[in-house]
Amino acid sequence: FAAFAFVALLTNGARGGNERTILAGVAASQLFNAITAYTISTSASAQQARDVMFWLLGSFSGVRWPEFQLVIVVVLAGLAVCLWYARTLDAFTFGDDAAASLGIAVPRVRLILFTTAALITATIVSMAGSIGFVGLVVPHVMRFFFGPLHRTLLIASALAGAILMVLADIASRLLIAPQSLPVGVVTALVGVPFFAVIIYRSRNK
């Protein structure tokens, strides 16, 4: 939530544009990664440092059923909130001015959705660590197959993201068996080339 507050501050609350929000997110990520690295370097033992490194790259190896139950509740509640605002998200694709002209309270709705996303993300990251590129790869693929309407896109992305995580976890346990890789390494191997393709295609449009 400190990272969320930092991003909200840099983006002028809920009034920041998409580009400003992305840049603020990158800045927050670098800042808190630096704080984490400093904490590990100064106060962690070798085993603790290894455990934290696995957590930073994402791993399901230490997840227990009680934590998983909490994640299910938070994710389903957050998904319900997002589905409630699905039509509003459709309007946002045309820009804030267009959404406001339809009577949507843009700052208030943006704040609600940012807070919901922060709650979901914080809960999952606290359990499994930071697993990159899933939020980039899956929605783009689902948008290609199911179109831009968020009521369908949100559900499809949630299901496809869960399937991708299961496959990535299996791959992380088999690639260098009997040892295991962090799940984030597997998703990065898939996500980085895909992200490069997205950037290349956007430049050619």
Language model features by range: what are they?
Residues 1-205:
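Alpha-helical transmembrane segments in inner-membrane proteins
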